[in-house]
Amino acid sequence: KRRTQQLRSTPEVLNSSQHSLQRAQFSRYAVNIVERLQNAGYQAYLVGGCVRDMLLNITPKDFDVATSATPEQVRAEFRNARIIGRRFKLVHIHFGREIIEVATFRANHPQNDEEEDSNQSSRNESGRILRDNVYGTLEEDAQRRDFTVNALYYDPVSERILDYANGVHDIRNRLLRLIGDPQQRYQEDPVRMLRAVRFAAKLNFGIEKHTAEPIRELAPMLREIPSARLFEEVLKLFLSGNASDTFEMLVDLELF
């Protein structure tokens, strides 16, 4: 039986005394967006790579915000906002050369066609997600994220971290772990196998054994991915500054 990383129904809340983050470390524009959305009555957090990297004392390349506000509601709050994307709508808020990406909380995908709205979300016969436009709650947003270390939500107003998946623990142990059942998550999006290698090499993390286990068997699924997306992901793999480690890991996991 495969072991899966399940999420808590309520997050572990880490107060400022329990972590190293300070709001002044983050982009003032991103912090301002969170404050304005919260003041307008929405939930809003800094999320993902910027929180992970800050906990590792790495300077983030960008800052992302997750919110309960829909793209249209976000645009109504910011004159300098533009809605982009078809597969999943995002908002880009421009501050000179800096762009902050704001995403609405996203929900899990129902497993059978009878449960889902085909206009919003669909999968092919192997389980790969084809379209992805289902909004959800904060808890659902955490559930659909790929790795525990990317499922951390930082509130710069209260300076608290919300941790649904023991992500802070995995960061401290330098371990990359998928949320949910690894085989199912790779089938939903085979590119996650390449992302596992990229993050492990970039962050100098080990890949948790249950996360690594299905990769060799499922590697052929990458042939289903559109060549443009695959090319983009391979570029990210080899341009992240860890090409040698990346190549060794790709060969070891039979992805190359």
Language-model features: locations:
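Catalytic cores of the polymerase beta-like nucleotidyltransferase superfamily
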Residues: 1-256
